[in-house]
Amino acid sequence: MRPSATRALANTFLALLGLGCPHPGAAPTPTAGEPELRVALAVGVQSVVLGGNESGELFVTDDGTGQAVGSIPAGARWIAIPDSATQGAKLRLVRPDGTATEPHTGIALVNVTENRFAMTNARRYRGRINVVAGRAGGGLTVVNRLGIESYLAGVVGPEIGGRRPDELAAVLAQAVVSRTFALGNRGRYESLGFDAYADTRDQVYNGVAVETPQAWDAVRRTAGQVLRYRGEIIDAFFHSTCGFSTAGVEEAFATGRTRPYLRPVSDQYAKGRYYCDISPRFRWREEWDAQKLRAIFTRTLPAVMPIGGDGLQPITDVEVTRTTRSGRVGELRIVFEHGDVRIPGGAVRSILRPEVDRTLSSTAFQLTGTKDGGRLTRLVAAGAGSGHAVGMCQWGAVGRARAGQDHRRILSTYFPGTTLDRIY
């Protein structure tokens, strides 16, 4: 799981049904007992353009009753919009001539031809697309419903990237971890009508376009396999680069309860060498002058403290006051001319940002400050790693694969005490 990210959503969402190509795949044979996953592609959008391509018409059904709503001719475009008469509780489909259908709580784009895929926002997806009104605080919700193995084929590549043949074990490990995470969190957004977001709030999912033979190979070779602890599917966190050691879950998340399988694990294999030292974010450095630091804190500190009408007070110091058991920042103290504020470790990356739109790479860092007249004029952070550091270190997994470790060993190392089980 990557760190949560709140993203601005566009007001218009494009949905097309397009003709698929043989690669990356004619529709795969479903695994027996394979669960379905509902993935939110967009939430709260104000219109969705629906259309068939030049090869054939698009069939649309009522999402609740299954009854036919209409057939969109090849090349035509209909638009789904919230129904004003029901204050957005339902939606209508507007035809090219301006006439509209009766209100529906939701509609489904039916995929009726083999090797064709539902398309939304110019991306192709397996399964079917549902457009639903009246959820998630208004607007329309666009959901892709598909088997979890097909979902994983669109997740593994974006999450761990294309890898060399000698790194395949890392891809297999990613497939297992991503499946475990998805199944362990299925139903988390039940009130919103889906199971997962298609971005870093859960896992990055980009559909058919990012499927590769390598991703499908990893998914098929690990089909149905998940990690369990004492018979229960685990919380399968993962991150880019631990930097030297993974972290306990309670170190990274304010509400994180201790779990025996989510504890610090060293990534060192020799003096001064680490499995993840091949990562471009293995070591990093950030610097702020007084003006930049003030601008950043003016934007980020209101989340944890009030700022008076006169603005932020001059900053006299920024210091680490507590470290965690894995050696990360457990608490950060920001000192002003009159008073201070203490930031818990889980919030540090969002408060001490390198840029307003970019969080700090990790909480594994040391600070050096320069002062003039008692005021902080320059702050430097020298750090290690990228991400929350809990669970599987992706670059560490790649390094371990290069060293000859198979995916079972990689998984048992990063999730000690767990078992690798096939559940369907």
Label the predicted regions.
Residues 2-424:
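Conserved, single-site charged/polar hotspot
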